[in-house]
């Protein structure tokens, strides 16, 4: 009987483990803090993309950082990204780093090996997204995989080769489900002792 219960619990925990392994969770996100295009978050000049926000009004929501409360009036900086190539409306950019602050201290850092930028003057969505992404920071869990981020652009001003935009942001990752496997082992061990 105990063996049957152990198998049932292990199966349920294994199913939860498999389900969580396939689902990404939002780590941090924010809505566009700019009231209009006169206060952009990003600028592109045909050779580089620069960005950041130091004005008020950016609330960084942190559902995937349990030790970090949502941050009102957050700021961020980004290293300048140089253009590697242009293919129509898609621009491939160098890697870089984005740092989010609570006004003083670093709370969330994104590093990436490269990025793509779709220019905001064609049909469809316009965004900036990184690849080979890694999240870090003082309270960022170290057991994340498949990290990803994207900025969705709005309020473009300028031309396709020289523009500024405002943006909203989201980031996601798949939490490492190793803790669920440990729970399964503990549950089986607990049933064996009874």
Task: Describe the predicted segments one by one.
Residues 2, 25, 181:
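RTX-like calcium-binding, glycine/aspartate-rich low-complexity repeat tracts
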């Amino acid at each position: 009987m105990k063996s049957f219960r152990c198998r049932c619990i292990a199966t349920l925990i294994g199913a939860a483990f498999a389900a969580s392994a396939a689902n990404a969770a939002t780590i941090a996100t924010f809505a566009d803090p700019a009231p209009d295009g006169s206060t952009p978050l990003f600028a592109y000049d045909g050779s580089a993309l620069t960005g950041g926000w130091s004005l008020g009004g950016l609330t960084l929501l942190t559902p995937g950082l349990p030790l970090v409360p949502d941050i009102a009036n957050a700021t961020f900086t980004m290293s300048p990204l140089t253009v590697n190539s242009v293919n129509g409306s898609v621009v491939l950019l160098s890697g870089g780093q984005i740092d989010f602050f609570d006004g003083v201290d670093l709370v969330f850092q994104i590093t990436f090996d490269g990025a793509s930028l779709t220019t905001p003057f064609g049909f469809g969505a316009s965004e900036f997204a990184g690849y080979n992404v890694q999240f870090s920071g003082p309270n960022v869990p170290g057991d994340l995989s498949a990290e990803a981020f994207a900025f969705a652009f709005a309020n473009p001003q300028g031309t396709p080769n020289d523009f500024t935009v405002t943006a909203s942001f989201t980031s996601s990752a798949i939490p490492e489900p190793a803790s669920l496997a440990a729970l399964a082992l503990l549950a089986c061990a607990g049933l064996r002792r009874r």
